[in-house]
Amino acid sequence: MARSGYTLPVFACAAAIAALQRLRQPAASIQSVDCHLIDPDQTVAIAIEQVAPLSPDRALAICRSDPGDNLDLTRGTPIWAEVQLSPRSPDQDSLAIEAGEGIGHSETGPAIYDYAQRLLRANLLPLLQTNEQLTVRLILPEGRRLAERTANAAFGVVEGLSLLGTHGVAEALSAPEQLQVFRDRLRQLSADPDLVIFCIGENGLDLSQKIGLPRDRQLKTANWLGPLLVEAGLLGIPRILLFGYHGKLLKLAGSIFHTHHHVADARREILAAYAIAAGASLEQVRSLLDFPTVDAATQYLDQTDPALASRLWPQIAEAIVDRSQAYIRRYSEQIPEIGVVLFGRDRQLLTASSQAQTWLTNRAIAQPLRYPSA
């Protein structure tokens, strides 16, 4: 059975708890701390690797990431939390959270997102006196290096990793056993003939909720898109909305239905092929293939030929629909309607298939599309 672990914010929070405990109890042995996950509503013990006082009012603690049986590059990476206690004035917040080395940042600030903020506040505020302020500085010593191997830059996060997540448990999404969990969830959703929303990854899940798509109809798919599309067909689910980052769902336009990069990655080649169909010149296609990432290629088109981009992305969305239905047709006589919504690195909606646009309109979700379908 695949083993679940915890998301990065949990280990950051545990390190902060341990550092604060060291200030409260300088002589105590701290091997682990209890951390309330909020979502799910449970308290778990998190191992602490090291903890040390730095001064009478400052301490440092270290955890190591354990994401369970996942293909996760943060496995074993250290997470440091440096805390400092100081007197609090009436106009100050009791908790100040700072991003240190290895924590990424975007145009809006440090990449310490909502769940991480709530987790820190829920666990640390009850430990403070009313006249105390705690400053927590989170550090990922290997964060800058690891970020080079992620898609963080595609979402505007640079110089480090993000503390992203909507819950505390890191399910073993890459393990075969997790596919069965997803199938069981899909069977539950099939009891209601309403739309089922396949959210590709944590960013897809988070953004779909923020724009108002119904949470109770969402299924986080990880990279198991092919098997889950087939399962949806076999279950007779009538409508599926694929909602995800354009650099991930682009693979479906090339009939790649297991989207983990360890399996296959031809995104630039797929983009170039559809660009030719949309009228790109040979020089433009060569430029697209020369860029290191799909995101860089997308920005190039946005800036140099928005007319081409406005043709290209809706065509890709429709191609994803066609290829997905063709894939289901191999295994099932029941073919659901499929809609596609793609978002970009700025977490704004890039384009949508014509069917998806209709569904969004019918649900009164008035999110603008950069490149709407004709």
From Swiss-Prot:
GO terms for molecular function: cobalt-precorrin-5B C1-methyltransferase activity. GO terms for biological process: anaerobic cobalamin biosynthetic process; methylation. It catalyses: Co-precorrin-5B + S-adenosyl-L-methionine = Co-precorrin-6A + S-adenosyl-L-homocysteine. InterPro entries: CbiD, CbiD_sf. It holds the Pfam family CbiD. Its EC number is 2.1.1.195. Pathway: Cofactor biosynthesis; adenosylcobalamin biosynthesis; cob(II)yrinate a,c-diamide from sirohydrochlorin (anaerobic route): step 6/10. Keywords: Cobalamin biosynthesis, Methyltransferase, S-adenosyl-L-methionine, Transferase. PANTHER family: COBALT-PRECORRIN-5B C(1)-METHYLTRANSFERASE. Belongs to the CbiD family. NCBIfam families: cbiD (TIGR00312). This is Cobalt-precorrin-5B C(1)-methyltransferase. The lineage of its organism: Bacteria, Bacillati, Cyanobacteriota, Cyanophyceae, Synechococcales.
